[in-house]
Amino acid sequence: MLDSRFVREQADRARQALAHRNEDPVMIDAFLGYDTARKDILAEIEALRHKRNVASDTIAQMKKAGQTADEPIAAMREVSAKIKELEVLLAENQEKSDALLMRIPNIPHASVPIGPDESANVTEREVGTPPAFDFAPRPHEEIGEALGIFDFARAAKIAGARFPLYKGAGALMERALINFMLDIHTTEHGYTECLPPLMVNAKTMTGTGQLPKFEEDLFKLERWGFYLIPTAEVPVTNIFADEILNEADLPIKYTAYTPCFRSEAGSYGKDTKGLIRQHQFNKVELVKFAHPEHSYDELEKLLADAETILQRLGLAYRVITLCSGDMGFSAAKTYDIEVWFPAQNRYREISSCSNFEDFQARRANIRFKRPGQKGTGFVHTLNGSGLAVGRTLAAILENFQTKEGAVEIPDTLRPYMRNMAVLSL
């Protein structure tokens, strides 16, 4: 959530930022309209309170003098009733103003390229060389079905479309990748592992920005009012909701493996085969709570932490900076990491690393205290995938496939897979 003072004092910048994000700048004008009305109502309430205080003094003096005060008492009651009406109106105005502010996206950082869509994204670097095959590489879903490690037909029978069923070495590799990623992030990168709830309440979803704007993307348990998490970012970021952290403890770094659940609303007909776009998938998440003065340094470190996994696995990838029109609602700056998929002959997203500055922290009320100073400030929150597990597995199948239909297991993953070197029939 944006700082309301920023919207008031820098309305032109806020309008421009919304236009750069393909959002209607009229939201800023609507907010300012509510703000003006709020000030007018407050001024009227204060004037009436002053009038009531004067009347109260007059009544006291009249009673002291033995005079009848029926008329000023009646007038004071009318003033009090009017004040109550205005207070209700003020509360309604505040509710509408807050609801609107919740739907205004974050302001892009100055380093973010301006553009309407992914065509304006900027490639920062390409790392590694995509493999050259002397045969037509097969897609991961075909490889997995042939090896007997995927069973999409039975997954569809059990749950419907866009659900995976891993078997045998496929399930083993998925688990191996999770453990490999967590081990790197905890032992080498300094993250603390946590295992959060997979269901959260609406307040938690609001804190990270999924609600109220993106409810259609979520799975909701209507009877209980819970939501299935779309990413571990949601519960992990909210660990410190409504808390005040010590400045000396920043940055605080967590990593978490969780299943993730997404409705994939609006993706009908896209990536209908394989592991790329699923309703349920596994992901290892990285979350940071950083000092505002150091959050962009922490973003670069977080990006490097996610890249390490791909480097250790020997997968070719590229890093791109998302333009203003392609960024997520809550982000101030985002890097995407895209891994090479030979059968598709293109890069596909496998991680998104973002700095939200104080946007989420203000919604979730996550503050920090500076020693020797009055008051508190909002921390900056960051997160990134470290990595999406199913897509990593799919990339391994495609990049390390052989003409004979086998798959060579990356050296670094073999200790997690009972020292298996090859997946084959």
From Swiss-Prot:
Pathway noted in the entry: Aminoacyl-tRNA biosynthesis; selenocysteinyl-tRNA(Sec) biosynthesis; L-seryl-tRNA(Sec) from L-serine and tRNA(Sec): step 1/1
GO term, biological process aspect, one: seryl-tRNA aminoacylation
Catalytic activity entry: tRNA(Ser) + L-serine + ATP = L-seryl-tRNA(Ser) + AMP + diphosphate + H(+); tRNA(Sec) + L-serine + ATP = L-seryl-tRNA(Sec) + AMP + diphosphate + H(+)
SUPFAM superfamilies assigned to the protein according to its UniProt record, in alphabetical order: Class II aaRS and biotin synthetases (SSF55681), tRNA-binding arm (SSF46589)
Enzyme class: ligase
Alphabetical keyword list: Aminoacyl-tRNA synthetase, ATP-binding, Cytoplasm, Ligase, Nucleotide-binding, Protein biosynthesis
Amino acids binding L-serine: T231, A232, E233, E285, S385
Binding of ATP, residues: R262, S263, E264, E349, I350, S351, S352
InterPro entries referenced in this protein's UniProt entry, alphabetically: aa-tRNA-synt_IIb, aa-tRNA-synth_II, aa-tRNA-synth_II/BPL/LPL, Ser-tRNA-ligase_type_1, Ser-tRNA-synth_1_N, SerRS_1_N_sf, SerRS_core, tRNA-bd_arm
One GO term describing the cellular component: cytoplasm
CDD domains: SerRS_core (cd00770)
Nucleotide-binding among keywords: yes
Entry keyword ATP-binding: yes
EC number(s) stated in the UniProt entry for this protein: 6.1.1.11
Localisation: Cytoplasm
Family per record: Belongs to the class-II aminoacyl-tRNA synthetase family. Type-1 seryl-tRNA synthetase subfamily.
HAMAP family: Ser_tRNA_synth_type1 (MF_00176)
Comment field on protein domains: Consists of two distinct domains, a catalytic core and a N-terminal extension that is involved in tRNA binding.
Quaternary structure annotation from Swiss-Prot or TrEMBL: Homodimer. The tRNA molecule binds across the dimer.
Annotated function: Catalyzes the attachment of serine to tRNA(Ser). Is also able to aminoacylate tRNA(Sec) with serine, to form the misacylated tRNA L-seryl-tRNA(Sec), which will be further converted into selenocysteinyl-tRNA(Sec).
The protein's name: Serine--tRNA ligase
Species this protein is from: Desulfosudis oleivorans (strain DSM 6200 / JCM 39069 / Hxd3)
Gene that this polypeptide is encoded by: serS
